[in-house]
Regions:
Chain A
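A conserved mid-domain beta-alpha-beta active-site/ligand-binding segment of alpha/beta enzyme cores
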Residues: 216-249
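Catalytic alpha-helical scaffold of carbohydrate-active enzymes acting on polysaccharides/glycoconjugates
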Residues: 2-213, 239-263, 269-312
């Protein structure tokens, strides 16, 4: 059976993008961004705190890290919950030891399930981000916008009592969006989102409710991707992050354009006892280059980038 | 199954004859080089809302697959110029495997490549429009349109072809040869160019395009560590360089800016190029230059050698 002729028609073939979400531009061609105190590299660390329900339905698709075994998949349920009980405290200790700050992207349901965890997260004073309801509630193409709106509002309402400042940013579970997610995030009063991994600096993102900023949070450099999906050694994870840091520092100095390293960390991955020292080696490297690195909350980084001029 | 409706799939594509590596006439590259090195950056466009194809899903997640789309878009927004910087440093010109729609979406990227005297060859229209399910007339239209776009926007004749997303039909190579192409990158059976059979009987050549050293295959499919990828490139070079003392070999490094140009990966590629380009006897070529040289100097000898091998077989 042959394809219809419209398979060779291209209604969105035009200059720029084939959608209207953002303008086309290349990183190297943009006006330079500069960070406070003349630092070369903005360092955004994000720690994702996630709840993977045992009765995963996989509506839309199953987010990575989900249940894979026949019900009840105690193996994956407990390995994920480990991050919220044990792993997070190793990660927080490592941050504290290196005088680093991170943002905390937290599934809303965790605030209902584990208020004791949220009180401890609150005590860090770190910026908190919405991270969806749980890891079995992905925002996928075709999701009913009424349900999606409810998930977003419920998530933000649940986290609000524990956030030091009003929540401005969002990371969708599995970085997945429906056709309406950007509009719904804007309508919920959020300023920025981290889902699109197509850039290394913040950029302007259009919604029907007004402009959102996109703060790309690297997928290919995150622990779950490198250690979990690619099965690379923990030591190799550290090498890769260190190589990225060194490259971006060099590129920033060479071009006199500020760069950003955005690193997502999962306590259920790097919080394991055999992995935490490799995360600490990464933090040691950041500390060794502290004269050139500006470690800040993502909303501060976004403000500084905006301050440099209109975003791409 | 990509056989036209009603046809029985073939057990052998019939595109090349068996030709053992130990019995071939010597290939002499320009300047007596041992290895013809060519770098093939894929400059691709993946669509936000591609039409469905019953034989292959363009994106794994329900549309919009924001993660898949953004992962590829990174190459165009961030990656190309990092890769170009490394290639400039070592005097390497790219042979661009081009989603022809990129000429229209992102002419700024094309200008950067054209200014460096890079070659452009066809990789279809979009990397989310597959050959699967196309009639022969439709596939011909797609191939010819991609070649016409390349000529219109760059002034170059499109000499090479790599089917979009490596999606093929039984007629792909035939159609490209008939449309005026000189070489295909779609066959991975050799480390030297080889003649390829096409139904028109044109002088047509397969130029090695290594899938094993393709960054997307190594990083995405084989999940290789960045530093190991750099080492794999060096190891492949060492062997092809050694063998190239006796007869010229081809080394291709196919790249995708959305893979190789990540901050944790670009250094491994740079190290490998630094190592390779520190050797004398490396012909920094393009796909077109390799194909033309081979057609002019080695093709006829190759046909004779292949025929002689066939005669070894009992009748």
């Amino acid at each position: 059976m042959n394809m219809d002729h419209n398979y060779l028609e291209y209604p969105h073939r035009r200059h720029g993008m084939d959608h209207d979400r953002y303008a086309w531009s290349m990183l190297a061609d943009r006006a330079p961004v500069s960070w406070p105190q003349g630092r070369s590299l903005a360092l955004w660390l994000n720690v994702s705190l996630e709840h993977f329900p045992l009765d995963a339905r996989g509506e839309g698709f199953k987010a990575p890290g989900n249940m894979t075994m026949p019900y009840p998949d105690l193996r994956h349920y407990t390995l994920r919950d480990y991050g919220n009980r044990v792993g997070i405290f190793r990660v927080l200790d490592a941050l504290k030891k290196h005088d680093l700050q991170a943002s905390l992207a937290v599934n809303g349901e965790l605030a209902i399930r584990y208020p004791a965890l949220l009180r401890r997260l609150h005590a860090t004073g770190f910026e908190m981000l919405g991270h969806g309801w749980n890891m079995d509630s992905v925002h996928y193409g075709g999701l009913d916008p009424v349900r999606e709106c409810d998930w977003i509002e419920r998530s933000l309402t649940a986290l609000a009592p524990y956030a030091s400042k009003p929540i401005r940013g969002w990371l969708s579970p599995a970085r997945s969006q429906s056709q309406d997610t950007p509009e719904l995030l804007r309508s919920a009063g959020l300023d920025w989102c981290a889902d699109w991994v197509n850039d290394e600096l913040p950029y302007a993102f259009a919604t029907r409710q007004g402009e959102l900023s996109m703060m790309p949070l690297s997928l290919e450099l995150e622990d779950r991707f490198i250690v979990g999906d690619n099965l690379h050694a923990e030591s190799d994870y550290a090498d890769q992050v260190i190589d990225a840091c060194d490259f971006l520092l060099d590129e920033a100095r060479r071009t006199d354009h500020g760069r950003m390293l955005a690193l997502n960390i999962h306590p259920w991955v790097m919080g394991q006892p055999h992995r935490i020292k490799h995360l600490e080696r990464v933090f040691d490297h950041f500390a060794a280059h502290s004269e050139a690195i500006w470690n800040a909350a993502p909303s501060e980084i976004l403000s500084a980038a905006n301050h440099a001029g209109p975003m791409a | 199954m990509t056989s036209p409706a009603g046809n029985i799939p073939k057990a052998d594509p019939g595109l090349f004859d068996y030709w053992p590596y130990d019995s071939r006439p010597k290939i002499s590259w320009p300047g007596g080089a041992r290895v013809a090195l060519w770098i093939a950056p894929n400059i691709e466009f993946y669509e936000y809302a591609p039409p469905p194809n019953p034989q292959r899903k363009p994106w794994p997640r329900p549309l919009p697959d924001v993660l898949g789309y953004a992962t590829r878009d990174y190459g165009n927004r961030v990656g190309h110029q990092r890769m170009m910087r490394v290639m400039d440093k070592y005097g390497l010109r790219g042979s661009v495997s081009l989603s022809a729609a990129t000429l229209i979406h992102h002419p700024e990227v094309i200008e950067l490549a054209a200014a460096r005297d890079w070659e452009f060859f066809s990789h279809g229209i979009y990397n989310t429009r597959y050959t699967y399910g196309l009639s022969e007339a439709q596939e011909r239209e797609m191939i010819e349109e991609s070649m016409a776009l390349i000529h219109h926007h760059t002034g170059q004749h499109c000499d090479g072809y790599l089917a979009p997303a490596l999606s093929h039909s039984e007629s792909t190579i035939d159609l490209f040869a008939e449309a005026g192409g000189a070489y295909t990158c779609d066959l991975f059976h050799d480390d030297q160019p080889t003649p390829a059979h096409t139904r028109s009987g044109k002088r047509f050549v397969s130029v090695p395009y290594s899938l094993e050293l393709n960054d997307t295959i190594t990083y995405v499919v084989n999940k290789v560590e960045p530093r190991r990828y750099g080492q794999m490139i060096k190891d492949a070079f060492d062997r092809l360089y050694a063998e190239g003392e006796h007869s010229g070999t081809v080394m291709c490094v196919p790249l995708h800016a959305y893979q190789v140009s990540h901050p944790h990966r670009i250094r491994a590629f740079e190290d490998a190029m630094d190592y390779i380009c520190g050797h004398a006897g490396v012909w920094k070529a393009t796909g077109r230059e390799i194909a033309r040289h081979y057609l002019q100097h080695s093709y006829d000898d190759a046909l004779a050698s292949i025929a002689a091998v066939a005669k070894e077989d009992p009748a």
